[in-house]
Curated annotation (Swiss-Prot):
Keywords: Disulfide bond, Ion channel impairing toxin, Potassium channel impairing toxin, Secreted, Toxin, Voltage-gated potassium channel impairing toxin. One of its GO terms (molecular function) is toxin activity. This is Scorpine-like peptide. Its main location: secreted. Residues 10-50 form the BetaSPN-type CS-alpha/beta domain. The keyword Secreted applies. Signal peptide: none annotated. The lineage of its organism: Eukaryota, Metazoa, Ecdysozoa, Arthropoda, Chelicerata. Expressed by the venom gland. GO terms for cellular component: extracellular region. InterPro entries: Long_scorpion_toxin_alpha/beta, Scorpion_toxin-like_sf. Belongs to the long chain scorpion toxin family. Class 3 subfamily. Disulfide bonds join C13-C37, C23-C42, C27-C44.
Amino acid sequence: GLIHKVTKVQQLCAFNQDMAGWCEKSCQAAEGKNGYCHGTKCKCGKPLSYRRK
């Protein structure tokens, strides 16, 4: 199911690295945005240098 898929995506990042490019791919598919790894999490459209204002 979808929930398992999301959980799997969480595992694709390690040490801020998009291990297989899947973070990027999933974000492009879902939102048309670049994917960035923050630690072990994949975030769409938010580079590591991103700061909330």
